[in-house]
Amino acid sequence: RMLKRRMIKLLEKLLSQRDGIHSEYGALLRYTQDYHKRLSIIRKVLVQEKEMFEGRKVSDRIVSIDRHYVRPIVRGKENKSVEFGAKVNNIQIDGISFIEHLSFKAFNEGIRLKDCIRMQQKLMNVRVRCVAADSIYANNANRKFCTKYGISTSFVRKGRAAKDEPLRKVLRSELSKERATRLEGSFGTQKQHYSLSRIKARNRKTEILWIFFGIHTANAILMIEKIRNKTAKAA
C-alpha cells in the first residue's frame, strides 16, 4: 500500500512538472494528436487509481494505456476469475460461427437470445425451430419468447411436466449434446489453430479484425471440408 501511494504521488508530480513546462513553453511546443490522447488517458488513470486507493469502486477501470478501450471482465472461471480483451457472443448454424455481438466491456449475453434468433432468421431466411444455449440464456423472458414462437430449447424444464415430457427430454438431451460437441469444440479449435488464444493486435480496429478473420478462417476451412465430404459421397 505504501508503494502504491508513492507511485500515485510520483505520477502526480510528473504531471505537475509537465503542466509547468507547458504553461511556460507551450507556445513553442508542438504536440501530436496521439500525445494529447495518451496524456488524457494517463490523467484518467491517475484519477481512477486515487479512487481505488481510497477504497472506492471504479466501474469503468482503464487497465492499459496503449489499449485503453479494454476493460476487466469478470468471468467466474476457476483458472481465470477476470479476463481482459474482447467478449464475443457467437451463434452457430450447422457448425458455422457468426459474431452476434462483440464488446471490450462486460455485457450480459443472457439477454441477447432474441437478437441471436433474429440474426439467424435474417441470415438463413428460415424460421428457427430449435435452440441450444448455455444455462445463462435460460431466463424467464427467453423461455416465454421461445414458447410464444414454438421454439424448442435445451433449457432444463421449470414447473410441471407436460404430457410429452419424455420426448421433450430426448430433444433437450440431443440439443445439449450438439451444442457441447459443435459450439464448445469450435471455441477450442479457433483458439488453438487460428490465433485467438493470444491476440497480439495493438489497437481496437486491428483486434476486431484479428477476431473476425480467426473465426471466419475457421469457418472457411470447415466449409471446404463439408464440400469435400459431399463430393466424395456423391462420387
Segments predicted by a language model, with ranges:
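Anion-binding and metal-coordination hotspots
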Residues: 1-235
